[in-house]
């Protein structure tokens, strides 16, 4: 049995599986790290040499659930929820 490049073509097992952080099939099973987002490290993997990849993954490309409401709260001066003052009839 040879151990060189000949045996590289004979592999049938998956080296990568789905990543639980980014969802891509980039999580290396033996290394236990994601090649795409760098999971389980705390910071997301990103490099300046891949500007196009940064554009795909940056803030504003997903649902931006929280950011949608920020401009609305900014206009009202970031007021917290407060009870409305009752208007009593002046006597």
UniProtKB/Swiss-Prot annotation:
One Pfam match: Ribosomal_L37e
Database matches in InterPro entries: Ribosomal_eL37 (IPR001569), Ribosomal_eL37/eL43 (IPR011331), Ribosomal_eL37_CS (IPR018267), Ribosomal_zn-bd (IPR011332)
A GO biological-process term: translation
Keyword Protein transport: no
Record's keyword annotation contains Oxidoreductase: no
Keywords, in A-Z order: Metal-binding, Ribonucleoprotein, Ribosomal protein, RNA-binding, rRNA-binding, Zinc, Zinc-finger
Cofactor: Zn(2+)
Zinc finger residue ranges, C4-type: 19-37
SUPFAM superfamilies assigned: Zn-binding ribosomal proteins
Cofactor comment: Binds 1 zinc ion per subunit.
Function in brief: Binds to the 23S rRNA.
Family as reported in the entry's similarity comment: Belongs to the eukaryotic ribosomal protein eL37 family.
Protein name as it appears in the record: Large ribosomal subunit protein eL37
Gene label: rpl37
């Amino acid at each position: 049995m040879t151990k060189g490049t000949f045996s590289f073509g004979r592999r049938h097992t998956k080296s990568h599986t789905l990543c639980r952080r980014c969802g891509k099939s980039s999580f290396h099973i033996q290394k236990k790290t994601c090649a795409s987002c760098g999971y389980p490290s705390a910071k997301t993997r990103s490099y300046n040499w891949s500007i196009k990849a940064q554009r795909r993954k940056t803030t504003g490309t997903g649902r931006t659930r929280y950011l949608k409401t920020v401009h609305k709260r900014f206009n009202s001066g970031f007021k917290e929820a407060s009870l409305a003052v009752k208007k009593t009839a002046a006597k």
